Amino acid sequence: MNSSPLPTPIYTDSYPKEFQQLLREKTENFAGRKFVFSAISDFLHSHSRGYFTIVGTPGCGKSSILAQYVSAHPRSIYYNAAVEGKNRAEDFLASVCTQLIDKYLAANGETSEIVKLKSQLQNLESHDGSWFLSLLLQQISDKLNVACETARHRQKLIIVIDSVDAIARTSQPPSTNLFYLPRYLGDRTYFILARRPFLREKSGLLIETPSQTLDLRDYPAQNREDVLNYIQQYLSTAPDLTQPEFCQQLATASENNFMYLSQMLKAIGENSHPDANLGESSLFPELPPGLAAYYQNHWLRMRGEGLSEVDLSVLKVLVQSTTGLSVSAISNIIDEDEYEIEKVLDNWIEFLNAQEIGGQICYSFYHASFREWLGKQSILE
């Protein structure tokens, strides 16, 4: 199996129907990201098995990267936990195990063994799914090992899981790996994951196999280049908007965030905002509806079951700050214990940028427009 992404053709029909429309949407106007695909390819060629994880803030393009990858590699297994109704472990196991059976074990038709496996899958309890997934992975690993003894090209089993952080943790025991992902992997078996920033001690994964993490935040120059390519490609049918200065200003306003960028470009394309002000971080007086809905989902996740007084105090400080603040600085401003502040920041880590400034880790919201949107919520007024 070729490990590098192909520009064409694009296939989505080999994946479950509930993911096909999403894959088509995420690969539309796709541009760049070669540095990510190169890293994936290098990992696959350097290791006989393993986990490769793409980490990035909301909207930075993780889902599109994975969608492009699996669309160009239809033998991959694909799952997206962010799709409505697909964030529980039992849903994941049912979908992935079915794909494994259909794509790798049922090549010769519905044999009695395949019928037996599908019957077992239908009658599995969610907590039994872990061993069944491991069983299928081992069977396929053995099959690939035998096949590659005579084949010139070494085929790999690649399972791609998007939005790992969207899992409903209540759907499985807290001591288990997210989605019951296996601790050990057989030869030629790989998982490619995408997730938002997380604390290492709360990764939800205990694995003893080769692994690598690529954090998109560590590649600002490459991200900027891809953003510019995306803008130019999107606006190629609107010559009056493709001037270099406009593209550069739009790229700067996007802060390399593709969700923000795609929504703004859509609004520009629909000419619904002729008064775009590139001097402002939000570009328009009002956010496009799609972006506002995206931020609303962030807000619901941040609020959880409710905000404490400390939560609100930290939130107000972060909303008012246009630069990063350290834990000690926040502590001095709101007169609260640093430990309590750290707990709040840890809970919101997926929506924050953390960077070292003057020897201290400073925190800010991942995008200026999200910070501004939060500042307009009634709870902060």
Per-region residue spans from a language model:
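Winged-helix-like regulatory helical subdomains adjacent to P-loop NTPase cores
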Residues: 25-27, 34, 280-333, 359, ...
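Conserved Walker B catalytic segment
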Residues: 145, 152, 156-194, 339-343
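P-loop NTPase Walker A phosphate-binding motif
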Residues: 50-81, 98, 195-207
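C-terminal leucine-rich, beta-strand-based interaction scaffolds used for sensing/assembly
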Residues: 60, 65-68, 297, 311, ...
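Amphipathic alpha-helical "lid/sensor" segments that cap RecA-like P-loop NTPase cores
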Residues: 8, 200, 243-289, 312-313, ...
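Conserved small helical "lid"/interfacial subdomain of P-loop NTPases
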Residues: 216-245, 288-299, 377
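Walker A/P-loop-proximal flanking segment of P-loop NTPase domains
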Residues: 3-60, 64-69, 149-150, 170-171, ...
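Mid-core helix/loop region of P-loop NTP-binding domains shared across ATPases and GTPases
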Residues: 112-161, 184, 242, 246-253, ...
